[in-house]
């Protein structure tokens, strides 16, 4: 798209093109996530911004929140900041496989519990949380349910209504296959979020406060029209290709890699692989070698791109016992191949022999 105006700011053709494209993206994402209203799909730059909006806009001093050890700093740091305002947080602990005990939701529930705020899947281990089970718990106790779907959106089905999700936060650049700088939050009917950022909206100019209706309520300033157009194209690709086909391919590669490295002497793989339903990532270490050294060797000697270090998941690393070493994470996407996967297996085996 070579030319696009500023959505919602003018009536000329370029501006209207932007408005129509952005609304089409709202409709596509609402359909993908089971969000009842397209105008409740609010765009942000990424899931970090979306989570900040949701967490700061839903909680008040005196509230209590349930979360888990699986969380990314995009959930953790906003929650820690809310603790400074008088919000209390209880984290469901993870075991050495990175799994939680769902009975801990009942154990940690308090009279002032306001919400469960958690990831759909660990970005480190690939372990998934049972959103339907957690959503049913929230519905039974009148709690808000805020989900960080950064690791699963576009690969695993999400139905906000069926899973009782109050706010779904997503990023465009991961499994949705969209451009960097895109993301958003889908807000269920009846959920009121205080605006995190206020300013120009192009409508209701004489109001001293942010307009009350979604999506304008949470969208101050110019939207990333070109990025959202790219995200729309990506969602259309997912719909045309089929989420099941995408997931089947990615999980097959991840399983192939896991089975190829799990028994290699000196290799330690993290996460629960007893279930076939898990995010298509595999995190490992080779003996006591620093994860960054392994990642550098993979990049320089084998042209294999991985991520090493702490992965913005400090509580998960504490649970796994990898705070000092970190971990090397292999991620498998729709455009990866069996040949690339086998090359990665061979590289890990060679490095483990050194």
Residue ranges and their predicted role:
Residues 1-354:
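Pyridoxal 5′-phosphate
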């Amino acid at each position: 798209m070579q030319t696009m105006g500023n959505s919602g700011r003018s009536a000329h053709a370029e501006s209207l093109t932007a408005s129509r494209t952005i609304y089409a993206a709202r409709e596509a994402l609402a359909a993908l996530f089971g969000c009842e209203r397209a105008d409740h799909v609010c765009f942000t730059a990424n899931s970090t911004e979306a989570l900040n909006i949701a967490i700061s806009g839903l909680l008040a001093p005196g509230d209590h929140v349930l979360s888990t050890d699986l969380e990314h700093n995009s959930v953790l740091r906003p929650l820690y900041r809310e603790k400074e305002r008088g919000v209390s947080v209880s984290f469901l602990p993870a075991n050495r496989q990175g799994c939680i005990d769902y009975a801990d939701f009942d154990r940690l529930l308090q009279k002032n519990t306001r919400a469960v705020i958690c990831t759909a899947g660990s970005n480190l281990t690939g372990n998934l949380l049972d959103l339907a089970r957690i959503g049913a718990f929230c519905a039974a106790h009148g709690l808000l349910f805020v989900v960080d779907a950064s690791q699963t959106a576009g690969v695993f089905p999400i139905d906000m209504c069926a899973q009782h999700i109050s706010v779904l936060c997503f990023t465009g650049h991961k499994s949705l296959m969209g451009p960097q700088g895109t993301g958003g939050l889908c807000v269920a009917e009846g959920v009121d979020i205080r605006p995190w950022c206020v300013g120009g909206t192009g409508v209701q100019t004489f109001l001293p406060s942010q307009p009350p209706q979604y999506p304008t309520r949470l969208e101050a300033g110019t939207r990333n029209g070109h990025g959202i157009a790219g995200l729309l194209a990506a969602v259309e690709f997912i719909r045309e290709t089929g989420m099941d086909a995408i997931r089947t391919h990615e999980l097959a590669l991840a399983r192939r890699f896991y089975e190829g490295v799990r028994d290699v002497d000196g290799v330690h793989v993290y996460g629960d692989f007893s279930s076939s339903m898990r995010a298509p990532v595999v995190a490992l270490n080779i003996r006591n070698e620093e994860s960054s050294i392994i990642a550098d060797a993979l990049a320089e000697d084998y042209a294999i791109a991985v991520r090493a270090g702490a992965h913005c998941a400090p509580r998960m690393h504490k649970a796994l016992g990898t705070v000092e070493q970190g971990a090397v994470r292999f991620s498998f996407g729709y455009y990866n191949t069996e040949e690339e996967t086998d090359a990665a297996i061979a590289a890990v085996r060679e490095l483990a022999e050194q």
